[in-house]
Amino acid sequence: MIGRISQPLLNTSQKFMAPAARTLMLHEHHGMKILQNYEIKVPPFGVAQDAETAFSEAKRIGGKDYVVKAQVLAGGRGKGRFSSGLQGGVQIVFTPDEVKQKAGMMIGANLITKQTDHRGKKCEEVMVCKRLFTRREYYFSITLDRNTNGPIVIASSQGGVNIEEVAATNPDAIVKMPIDVNVGITKELAHEIAVKMGFSKDCEQQASEIIEKLYQMFKGSDATLVEINPMAEDVNGDVYCMDCKLLLDSNAEFRQAKLFDLKDKKQEDELEIRAAAANLNYIRLDGTIGCMVNGAGLAMATMDIIKLHGGEPANFLDVGGGATVEQVTEAFKIITADKDKVSAILVNIFGGIMRCDVIAQGIIQAARELDLKIPIVVRLQGTKVEDAKALIATSQLRILPCDNLDEAAKMVVKLSNIVDLARATNVDVKFELSI
């Protein structure tokens, strides 16, 4: 519920690589419904788009203990905060009236978590579920492992907490089992996993059956991640999946049309939608230095070196290996869409398949179309690099070339600081470069 696995295998840097895989994340309540379709036990729940409906759902569910969960596509909800002042996107309450009150504070407000930017994401609906009293909680997930090129089970006897913290402080509590995709999870393997997770003897059979069904769900929905945190034994000896995080492979949209119809476009960043339409891998971040790079690994290294020199990247943007002039121009338009935020741009291209002269043409076209006033530092190496340098040199634009990445990062951070200082004091700054 609180901690989430970073794909793959607890590698926290993978959050910047998500667009390369292009996955679809479904809301928790959709995941819970899919669990039910596979005859997996979940707590009684309902979904509401307003406070009155939340009250009605609580009355329908019955009982005296409820959990109200904000439905936003971001991790860290439990420790998040709302623009309405409410602390926490997961609230435990005891009456339908309290359900109504908390839902009213969530719906329509923005939830800011460690996985959102400073604006957060708007909560359009809440999930109301019956609070079950558990005696033991476990962590279970199936994801894709690049090392074995197949599914892998990652599980733990410690659930309901941040699994990355468990991996760091008590790695022996983590169970990792690669799965042969040609065989899947057999009854015997499911039982072995349940035993290693530490289920009580009375619950081993139930847990084994759920693990088998979760693999069927993973495969049947073309998922890249099925995560249950926690999977729990209740006081009556029943095993439940208390929540569900489900990521689907966008390459399978053609055969998972019903699931992809569940996509919540309102939760997607408008710039990320534009980037995807242009076949660009883009994630908006909170910094001030725009980045345009080819290759996810080089893009992450570029962001690291910007931070090393005291700057903050405004985005992750991988133009890929076959970008056109039009794509490069669109990339600049996306980077500079928030004109009051981005104060400098670093272009870092290592031309292999990607030709540096194409990048240069795109930079020049974008700088002219957008009449860019902010400094642009360009580091180009590789295929057609001399042609690219010649294009930039004859463009009569104030683009700052730099062959050394470390020096380029230092330069863009200094220039960004100058622009930020000028903006803070309401002073216009113009950069001149001797030609």
From Swiss-Prot:
Entry EC no(s): 6.2.1.5
Main location class: mitochondrion
GO MF assignments: ATP binding; magnesium ion binding; succinate-CoA ligase (ADP-forming) activity
Residues passing through the membrane, by range: none
Pathway: Carbohydrate metabolism; tricarboxylic acid cycle; succinate from succinyl-CoA (ligase route): step 1/1
Similarity annotation: Belongs to the succinate/malate CoA ligase beta subunit family. ATP-specific subunit beta subfamily.
Functional description taken from the UniProt entry: ATP-specific succinyl-CoA synthetase functions in the citric acid cycle (TCA), coupling the hydrolysis of succinyl-CoA to the synthesis of ATP and thus represents the only step of substrate-level phosphorylation in the TCA. The beta subunit provides nucleotide specificity of the enzyme and binds the substrate succinate, while the binding sites for coenzyme A and phosphate are found in the alpha subunit.
Annotated organelle transit peptide span: 1-20
Binding site for ATP: K69, G76, R77, G78
Class of enzymatic activity (EC top level): ligase
Binding locations of substrate: N294, G352, I353, M354
GO biological process, one term: tricarboxylic acid cycle
Co-factor: note: Binds 1 Mg(2+) ion per subunit.
Stored InterPro entries: ATP-grasp, ATP-grasp_succ-CoA_synth-type, ATP_grasp_subdomain_1, Succ-CoA_synthase_bsu_CS, SUCC_ACL_C, Succ_CoA_betaA_euk, Succ_CoA_ligase-like_bsu, Succinyl-CoA_synth-like
Record's subunit section: Heterodimer of an alpha and a beta subunit. The beta subunit determines specificity for ATP.
Source species taxonomy: Eukaryota, Metazoa, Ecdysozoa, Nematoda, Chromadorea
Site (Important for substrate specificity): D65, F133
Keyword field: ATP-binding, Ligase, Magnesium, Metal-binding, Mitochondrion, Nucleotide-binding, Transit peptide, Tricarboxylic acid cycle
Residues where Mg(2+) binds: N229, D243
Coiled-coil ranges from the UniProt annotation: none
Protein name, per record: Succinate--CoA ligase [ADP-forming] subunit beta, mitochondrial
